[in-house]
């Protein structure tokens, strides 16, 4: 369900409704348990652009995939501005967590990053800084056949749009796995989980 409204309408960027609804970057929406299926309501703002709509979808994906991979703590950490940089030093990353790595939280191990953090970002929404970074983000285009060891190469903001929100988010979404099969009991078509939350166990 897509809703469009003006500023201060109070919409969540995305919120889930229905029986068994869970957090999806907002909500869950109360009073909807009588609906037998889960569905997500997207709340868009007429004052914002397509880039922000893609950002809303990206956060929906992050939240739901974090639940699939049991990585809610990791997602919270990745967005915590007061994070302890050493907190992940001994962590064995699952595939979702590895996808989300950016240089600030995993120096030398940058993958695709998050919706707010490109592989070289130092802070939220910093998609255009010129600092080069070693990243294996393009390995994700080969999923599930991720190279071992990863193919780290030098990337810059030019690779994901030079600071353009829409270009970065399209780049990020294009690397989310979307192929047949399963790995460790989780579908290789990650999109199915955040497009249809009824597929989330």
Model regions: which residues?
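Short catalytic/ligand-binding loop motif for oxyanion handling, primarily in non-cytosolic enzymes
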Residues: 10-14, 61-62, 69-70
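Active-site recognition of the HExxH zinc-binding catalytic motif
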Residues: 47-68
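Active-site-proximal segments of metallohydrolase catalytic domains
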Residues: 1-26
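Flexible, surface-exposed loop/gating regions in the mature catalytic domains
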Residues: 22-46, 171
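Surface-exposed extracytoplasmic segments
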Residues: 42, 48, 160-162
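Active-site-proximal beta-strand/loop segments in catalytic clefts of secreted hydrolases
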Residues: 4-8, 43-45, 63
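Acidic, proline/glycine-rich low-complexity IDRs
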Residues: 25, 53-57, 181-184, 192
């Amino acid at each position: 369900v897509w809703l469009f409204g003006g500023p201060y309408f109070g919409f969540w960027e995305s919120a889930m409704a229905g029986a068994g609804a869970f957090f999806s970057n907002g909500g869950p929406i109360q009073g909807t348990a009588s609906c037998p299926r889960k569905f997500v309501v997207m709340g868009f703002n007429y004052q914002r652009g397509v880039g922000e709509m893609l950002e809303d979808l990206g956060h929906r994906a992050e939240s739901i995939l974090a639940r699939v991979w049991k990585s809610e703590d990791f997602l919270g950490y990745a967005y915590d501005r007061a994070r302890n940089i050493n907190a992940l030093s001994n962590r064995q990353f699952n595939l979702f967590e590895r996808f989300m790595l950016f240089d600030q939280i995993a120096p030398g191990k940058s993958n695709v990053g998050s919706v707010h953090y490109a592989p070289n970002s130092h802070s939220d929404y910093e998609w255009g800084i010129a600092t080069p970074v070693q990243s294996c983000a393009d390995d994700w285009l080969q999923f599930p056949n991720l190279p071992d060891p990863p193919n780290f190469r030098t990337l810059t903001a030019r690779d994901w749009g030079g600071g353009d929100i829409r270009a970065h988010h399209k780049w990020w979404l294009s690397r989310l796995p979307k192929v047949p099969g399963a790995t460790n009991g989780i579908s290789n078509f990650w999109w199915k989980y955040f497009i249809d939350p009824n597929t989330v166990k």
